[in-house]
Amino acid sequence: MNIPATVITAVLCFGITALLGFVAIPALRKLKFGQTILDIGPAWHKSKNGTPTMGGVMFIAGVVISFAAGIAIMWASGAIDMDGVGSQKLAKAISAVVMALMFGFVGFVDDLIKVKKKQNEGLKPMQKIIMQVLIIAAFFTSHVIAGDTSTVITFPFLGQFDFGIFYYIVMGLGILYLVNAVNLTDGIDGLCS
C-alpha cells in the first residue's frame, strides 16, 4: 500500500466533497429538490420538509475524482505495476468504485422519484433490494472474471477461514447491509449525507 498516495486521496476526497457541499446544497434548495416528510410521526419532523435531498451525488463525485487522482499519483510514482498482481489489484479497486457508482445511481433514482412525486416514497423496498443484489452479483462476477476466486476471509486475531460457496452469501449480505445501514438508522428524512 502506498501510504502517501492513500493519505492524499483521503484528504482530496474530503476536500472535494466538502467543496461540492457548499455549491450543491444551495443549488438543490434553489431547484426545490427537497425531501417531503410523511404526516405520521412527531409534529417537529414537519420542520424538515424541503430539506435538500440527493446529497449522495457529492459523496460519489468526491470518491470518483479522488480515486482517479490517487491512481494517477501512484502510477506516476511507479507504485502501480501494470503486470500481474498490480493490474489485478487495480481491476478489483475499479470494480469496487463502479459498484459504488451503481449503488449511488440507485439512490439517485430513488431520490429523483421522491422529488418528482413530491412524496417520501421513491423506489419500492423490493425494487431497491433486487437492484442492489444484481449489482453485488455483477461485482462478484467481475472478481471471478479477473481471476480472484478466493473464498477466504481474514479475521483479526482469529486467522483465516475459508467459507467456500458461503463466502458469496456472507459477503453479499455484508455489502447489502452496509449499503442500507444509513437508510435503516436515519428514519426521519433519509438525509444523513
Language model: regions and residue ranges:
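"…together with the soluble PPM/PP2C metallo-phosphatase catalytic core" -> "…together
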Residues: 1-193
